[in-house]
Amino acid sequence: RGFFYQCTGEDDLSKLLDKEKINGYIGFDCTAESLHVGSLLQIMCLRLLQRHGHRPIVLLGGGTTRIGDPSGKDKTRTILSEEEIEKNIKNIEKILKNFLDIKDPKTKPIFVNNYSWLKNLNYISFLINIGKHFTINKMLSFDSVKTRLEREQSLSYMEFNYMILQAYDFLELNKKENCVLQMGGSD
């Protein structure tokens, strides 16, 4: 009760969860060696999904960490080195394995790093095939963008595109891992 802030298609999701076992994911940026207490809610969502017989997918944002999530930030993040990001990914994966059941073959979590599909994206092709589905109007309505603009704080083009990369993550996970559920923060 009160665990979720909002849900798109809640009735359809309930029916789907009752009817079949699904794969659902949450993404974690790897900007630090460890997770913070704010990540506990997301971890508990993955555990809850798993305890009900579904398979959690943990997306470790090796690619998106290189850009930096603008949510809740008033300035552009410092770009981490590839070595720092890889170290953080290993540490965070180790932490998450303490919370999730890694032994049950039916619900064993899938760990993926979005750098594997983001590193070789062809920019022109990406804009033509993916970018056409996003409107600036909608992107300007997100809290992370509105807040920065209202405070007259800069928001780089790189950060502005972060949400498109998140959507692309879901597309890739749907194709590669049959993922049908995305969970995460409100923005």
Regions found by a protein language model. Give the residues of each.
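NTP-dependent nucleotidyl-transfer catalytic core
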Residues: R1-S186
